[in-house]
Curated annotation (Swiss-Prot):
Residues 770-799, 816-843, 950-1018, 1186-1221, 1256-1284 are annotated as: Disordered. The number of the intragenic tandem repeats varies between different S.cerevisiae strains. There is a linear correlation between protein size and the extend of adhesion: the more repeats, the stronger the adhesion properties and the greater the fraction of flocculating cells. The Ser/Thr-rich repeats are also important for proper cell wall targeting of the protein. One of its GO terms (cellular component) is side of membrane. This is Flocculation protein FLO9. It comes from Saccharomyces cerevisiae (strain ATCC 204508 / S288c). Belongs to the flocculin family. A lipid is attached at residue 1299 (GPI-anchor amidated glycine). Sequence repeats lie at residues 278-322, 323-367, 368-412, 413-457, 458-502, 503-547, 548-592, 593-637, 638-682, 683-727, 728-772, 773-817, 818-862, 892-906, 907-921, 922-936, 1013-1063, 1085-1135, 1136-1186. Residues 74-249 form the PA14 domain.
Length: 1322
């Protein structure tokens, strides 16, 4: 093959590729549902600057639908695309056409552009949809309707970036399935897909042969990757006409109709579309008859087609006009239709219709009647009456009754715009239910006006035929009387091309004008036959007189009748003619409207029917309108009546009035009943005895005068007779935040219906804010404070427990809850007693009574702020009887809340909640008192039975205790309980890890007077034990250990005696009394023994507490001092869990009269820990295993403090002038990795020896040593051994109570125990 032939072949192949001529038959569609103008456009996401995806044919055919659909628009007829990116210049932002681009990035007429041309830009330039035209894929679908049969050539003048076009069913989309997902066909009519790294050629075309009148599916898919977007679309019709861009009238949209049969037309060439055939035939009737006939025609393809033939039959003879006008004596125009039968010249009977119009002979108003009524709107009703015409046929007449309100109101005529071409007036009937519950029909006249100017009922439409067609369409409108009315709409269809008129005028020899319609068939330019209508008007060649005859007669009205005569025309044929005979009365007559007075309160208009016999002997029905007016002036139908209720009642009553014609008429009367006295609306206020305002809603039923019940609502507000707070309640509570809760209460109103009321309770903390205490009055004689627990469900649906503190105060004078009592103690004691009172709500409430016991003797104290020393003097000291425990007993002590203050406003407080359990009969646990303090205080029993227990013994159960020394500013309060738990702080003798001990020796210089303490030997004696229960007392004799101790302070000697029963066996009655005279004060002590009971012991370690039940001996003792009797109760547990002990050797140094001796003795080491405010205290006790009774006298003189430390064996030497105590500890114990200083004396605790305790404080470091008891040290839990520092804030309260401890340390073993515990509490 030569090169020339090869090039020729290549050109042919290229031409065939660019020009895709569809030679095969293209499938068409005939959708049956309603069509819409334009095409649908769907938008899909496309990645910016993606230059490969749109090169894939599968993506352009259907793959785009898998991307994100951005939205869609419809009704698009201008389907070409021309998008220009914006150019941002110094003069503004303007779109820049691609052909105006120059240079690096400039636009002609605009200048240099500063923006980036290859980024995404948003706009509505593509069919009004807001998207990024720079990067998007869109799909256009619709049906192409060819106006001609032949070849249609579609063309893309250029493509930027990629596009395809498909035409035909099964190529673009299936028939009647436009909205379905795209099909997978890649048989494109135009393939404008941009090749990889290339550009598609310009002027790409595709040709499709289509048949006129069929719809062809068409789809266009376009993609743009960046910047400008261009796709100009055009089509060339078979006649050579080119349509570009705007495809108005060629593209349509149909909704999916997948169930439509025969939607697809595979071969339109074999499918015949038939037109309607109109045929005109002459006939012998006197009017034009139009009928529709259905025929089946077999087309050239052998397929039968249904055709519709309209047959118009026109009369062959002349006839007179069928409309007749007659005068009559009524007040309105009546139109009736009469049917007559005429025998034509051909002997065939023909039915003719004569329209008779009867007009009134006198001037009158129309049939519209206006009546006043008492409603608030205008009511228009239509009344139907039947009038029998002169021909004996009944005719329906309509009377419109307009009832206008006596007050201004809007009309009932509504005007609405609509999209049709004519004005429509319809009457709509609505039913309104009045206050009496009866429905009333109302008429609303709705006038719908076209949004564009148009003529009345004549509609003009364009069509593709060559002549003007006028057809009459009959519609039925249902009036307000419920009867259908036929309306006629004349539709004029005009050809879209110019044509000559079809009206022809011909002369003829008859006496009237004849108009007939003739059908001719004209073959159009498309080769199809078209039926045309020619209207032939035949006019008479000679003049003729009319057929109307007027005759006088003797009646009172004008009668018009039609008479039929037969006239032989000039053609020798008989013609039926109609003569209208008008008979007029010879005398004047009045109108038919009659006015009559009557006794009612309104104007009544009724229609009466009378029958009049005319001159022709035929009866004629006449209508007389009777207007009855009231004889006296009256208001409208609204009636006002007074009544005795407190509100205005409006009811609607329905009455029936029978008119003079005997027909009942429904009338509505509105009755307004007003109260005879002034009152507020429906709100009623009533007093009641509660403490809050209640608002309830009550429903009452009022029966109106018409006997119908009416529901009315009365709001009843009940206000308290006494002042009360609102529904917002403020209460204090012990938490740290303000709580607001909503409580729902249900109040049952007088109607028995419960009403929910809401009380807002605001609980505020008692500190740092307003106190929100709620005070309520009650009939009790004291103030009651109760704590109520409520559960409030929050907005998150979770329940929250809230505490409400309610303080109820007595409404009358009652006993004060604070009681003051004298006692023989040396300080003021405040105790709290708990009583249970059942409140008005039936719930028990704990009430607290504070009892203040004041000392009968004065105590003076002095504070030196420079040295921190406190000197306390008691002007009169008395022995205090302190019952001790049996040798095998144990003690359980719980103490809490210790506070102290001095006169210089220096407040030191600590909270302690502890439980101490030890197997030793004496608890060797202490805070060591300073030797510089000289004081004498009395000690009270640590244990007292109470729900919450008390350190201070009283004759009643107590809760809490406070102490204050009247001569100083120091005070302390504590609370203890036999069965008490607290996770905060515990004293426990349970097993402890080893605690490292060190020895400290120091000398304290003091200028205060020395304190001398003497401890005597104990002896056993018999005592009389008085046991009381339920106010019945018995006496018994029991063995007891008697211990005595004396303390001399500044020359004042105090002796302490303790009786401790050692047996609970009851014996013969015997009383042991001890009387001691000291400075004129007499004290008498009696100790009794009660039966054995069971107590609960709480043991706590590492914040874990457990309870055990143990039998205990209950011992009571009474002391009478200056006539004041105090009862002391002691519980001595018989057994308990023994703590882990260690046995070691200690060196006991005994000194007397300046001579000291040392002995070595085994000792039991007991340890206990206490946690107070996260400070861990370890207590160790060395108990020498010897029973030697010792008497120790210690004196404190001024000396120099000296401390030595021995790493081998801890040794502490305390020099006090004449007396010196040396203690050596050979064991080391450690706990919690904290170093603690422990010193132990060689004093035999069991032997109840005691010595002076010393306290030293320097800066913030505190070292405590004891020569007679165990020692301890304090540090926070987290303090390392190298930085253990005591709290300086404890110095004042330690020194305050050290004096009391010093005095007790010189006494008996129990006094030593009490002093140790007192110091430990500090």
């Amino acid at each position: 093959m030569s090169l020339a032939h090869y090039c020729l072949l290549l050109a042919i192949v290229t031409l065939l590729g660019l020009t895709n001529v569809v030679s095969a038959t293209t499938a068409a569609c005939l959708p049956a549902n309603s069509r819409k103008n334009g095409m649908n456009v769907n938008f899909y996401q496309y990645s910016l600057r993606d230059s490969s995806t749109y090169s894939n044919a599968a993506y352009m055919a259907y793959g785009y639908a898998s991307k994100t659909k951005l939205g869609s628009v419809g009704g698009q007829t201008d389907i070409s695309i021309d998008y220009n990116i914006p150019c941002v210049s110094s003069s503004g932002t303007f779109p820049c056409p691609q052909e105006d681009l120059y240079g690096n990035w400039g636009c002609k007429g605009i200048g240099a552009c500063s923006n980036n041309p290859i980024i995404a830009y948003w706009s509505t330039d593509l069919f009004g949809f807001y998207t990024t035209p720079t990067n998007v894929t869109l799909e256009m679908t619709g049906y192409f309707l060819p106006p001609q049969t032949g070849s249609y050539t579609f063309k893309f003048a250029t493509v930027d970036d990629s596009a395809i076009l498909s035409v035909g069913g099964s190529i673009a989309f299936e028939c009647c399935a436009q909205e379905q997902p795209p099909i997978t066909s890649t048989n494109f009519t135009i393939n404008g897909i941009k090749p990889w790294n290339g550009s598609p050629p310009d002027n790409i075309t595709g040709t499709v042969y289509m048949y006129a009148g069929f719809y062809y599916p068409m789809k266009i898919v376009y993609s743009n990757a960046v910047a400008w977007g261009t796709l100009p679309i055009s089509v060339t019709l078979p006649d050579g006409t080119t349509v570009s861009d705007d495809f108005e009238g060629y593209v349509y949209t149909f909704d999916n109709n997948l169930s439509q049969p025969n939607c697809t037309i595979p071969d339109p060439s074999n499918y015949t579309v038939s037109t309607t055939i109109t045929t005109t035939e002459p006939w012998t009737g006197t009017f034009t008859s139009t009928s529709t006939e259905m025929t089946t025609v077999t087309g050239t393809n052998g397929v039968p087609t249904d055709e519709t033939v309209i047959v118009i039959r026109t009369p062959t003879t002349a006839s007179t006009i069928i409309t007749t006008t007659e005068p009559w004596n009524s007040t309105f125009t009546s139109t009736s239709t009469e049917l007559t039968t005429v025998t034509g010249t051909n002997g065939v009977r023909t039915d003719e219709t004569i329209i008779v119009i009867r007009t009134p002979t006198t001037a009158t108003t129309a049939i519209t009647t206006t009546e006043p009524w008492n409603s608030t709107f205008t009511s228009t009703s239509t009344e139907l009456t039947t009038v029998t015409g002169t021909n004996g046929l009944p005719t329906d007449e309509t009377i419109i009754v307009i009832r206008t309100p006596t007050t201004a109101t809007t009309a009932m005529t509504t005007t609405q715009p609509w999209n049709d071409t004519f004005t429509s007036t319809s009457t709509e009937l609505t039913t309104v239910t009045g206050t009496n519950g009866l429905p009333t029909d109302e008429t609303i006249i709705v006038i719908r006006t076209p949004t564009t100017a148009t003529t009345a009922m004549t509609t003009t439409q364009p069509w593709n035929d060559t002549f003007t067609s006028t057809s009459t369409e009959l519609t039925t409108v249902t009036g307000t009387n419920g009867l259908p009315t036929d309306e006629t709409i004349i539709v004029i269809r005009t050809p879209t091309t110019a044509t000559t008129a079809m009206t022809t005028t011909q002369p003829w020899n008859d006496t009237f004008t004849s108009t007939s319609t003739e059908i001719t068939t004209v073959t159009g330019t498309n080769g199809l036959p078209t039926d045309e209508t020619i209207i032939v008007i035949r006019t008479p060649t000679t003049a003729t007189t009319a057929m109307t005859t007027t005759q006088p007669w003797n009646d009172t009205f004008t009668s018009t009748s039609t008479e039929m005569t037969t006239v032989t025309g000039t053609n020798g044929l008989p013609t039926d003619e109609t003569i209208i005979v008008i008979r007029t009365p010879t005398t004047a007559t009045t109108a038919i409207t009659t006015t009559e007075p009557w006794n009612s309160t309104f104007t009544s208009t009724s229609t009466e029917m009378t029958t009049v016999t005319g001159t022709n002997g035929l009866p004629t029905d006449e209508t007389i309108i009777v207007i009855r007016t009231p004889t006296t002036a009256t208001t409208a139908i609204t009636t006002t009546q007074p009544w005795n209720d407190t509100f205005t009642s409006t009811s609607t009553e329905m009455t029936t009035v029978t008119g003079t014609n005997g027909l009942p008429t429904d009338e509505t009367i509105i009755v307004i009943r007003t109260p005879t006295t002034a009152t507020t609306a429906m709100t009623t206020t009533q007093p009641w005895n509660d403490t809050f305002t209640s608002t309830s809603t009550e429903i009452t039923t009022v029966t109106g005068t018409n006997g119908l019940p009416t529901d009315e609502t009365i709001i009843v507000i009940r206000t308290p007779t006494t002042a009360t707070t609102a529904m917002t309640t403020t209460q204090p509570w012990n938490d740290t935040f303000t709580s607001t809760s909503t409580e729902m209460t249900t109040v049952t109103g007088t109607n028995g219906v419960p009403t929910d009321e809401t009380v807002i309770v605001i609980r505020t903390p008692t500190s740092e804010g307003l106190i929100s205490t709620t005070t309520e009055p009650w009939t009790g004689t004291f103030t009651s404070t109760s704590t109520e627990m409520t559960t409030v469900t929050g907005t998150n649906g979770q329940p929250t427990d809230e505490t409400v503190i309610v303080i109820r105060t007595p409404t009358s004078e009652g006993l004060v809850t604070t009681t003051t009592e004298p006692w023989t103690g040396t300080f003021t004691s405040t105790s709290t007693e708990m009583t249970t009172i059942t409140g008005t709500n039936g719930q028990p409430t704990d009430e607290t009574v504070i009892i203040v016991k004041t000392p009968t003797t004065a105590i003076s104290s002095s504070l030196s702020s420079s040295s921190g020393q406190i000197t306390s003097f008691i002007t009169s000291a008395r022995p205090i009887i302190t019952p001790f425990y049996p040798s095998n007993g144990t003690s359980v002590i719980s103490s809490s809340v210790i506070s102290s203050s001095d006169t210089s406003s220096l407040v030191i407080s600590s909270s302690v909640t502890s439980s101490l359990v030890t197997s030793s009969p004496v608890i060797s646990s202490s805070f060591i008192s300073s030797p510089v303090i000289s004081s004498t205080t009395t000690s009270a029993s640590i244990l007292s039975e109470s729900s919450k227990s008390s350190v201070i013994p009283t004759s009643s159960s107590t809760s809490g205790s406070s102490e204050s020394e009247t001569g100083s500013a120091s005070s302390a309060s504590s609370s203890s309980s036999i069965s008490s738990e607290s996770p905060k702080s515990t004293y426990s003798s349970s097993s402890l890890p080893p605690v490292t001990s060190a020895t400290t020796s120091q000398e304290i210089t003091s200028s205060l007077p020395p304190v001398t303490t003497t401890k005597t030997s104990e002896q056993t004696t018999l005592v009389t034990v008085t046991s009381c229960e339920s106010h019945v007392c018995t006496e018994s004799i029991s063995s007891a250990i008697v211990s005595t101790a004396t303390v001399t302070v500044s020359g004042a000697t105090t002796e302490y005696t303790t009786w401790c029963p050692i047996s609970t066996t009851e014996i013969t009655k015997q009383t042991t009394e001890t009387t001691k005279q000291t400075k004129g004060t007499t004290e008498q002590t009696t100790e009794t023994t009660k039966q054995t009971t069971v107590v609960t012991i709480s043991s706590c370690e590492s914040d874990v507490c457990s309870k055990t039940a143990s039998p205990a001996i209950v011992s009571t003792s009474t002391a009478t001092i200056n006539g004041v009797t105090t009862e002391y109760t002691t519980w001595c547990p018989i057994s308990t869990t023994e703590s882990k002990q260690q046995t070691t050797l200690v060196t006991v140094t005994s000194c007397g009269s300046g001579v000291c001796s040392e002995t070595t003795s085994p000792a039991i080491v007991s340890t206990a820990t206490a946690t107070v405010n996260d400070v861990v205290t370890v207590y160790s006790t060395w108990r020498p295993q010897t029973t030697n009774e010792q008497s120790v006298s210690s004196k404190m003189n001024s000396a120099t403090s000296e401390t030595t430390t021995n790493t081998g064996a801890a040794e502490t030497t305390t020099s006090t002038g004449a007396a010196e105590t040396k203690t050596v500890v050979t064991s080391s114990i450690s706990r919690f990795n904290h170093a603690e200083t422990q010193t132990a004396s060689a004093t035999d605790v069991i032997g109840h020896s005691s010595s002076v305790v010393s306290v030293s404080e320097t800066g913030n470091t505190k070292s405590l040593t004891s020569s007679g008891l165990s020692t301890m040290s304090q540090q926070p839990r987290s303090t390392p051994a190298s930085s253990m520092v005591g709290s300086s804030t404890a110095s004042l309260e330690i020194s305050t109570y050290a004096g009391s401890a010093n005095s007790l340390l010189a006494g008996s073993g129990l006094s030593v125990f009490i002093a140790s515990l007192l110091l430990a509490i500090i």
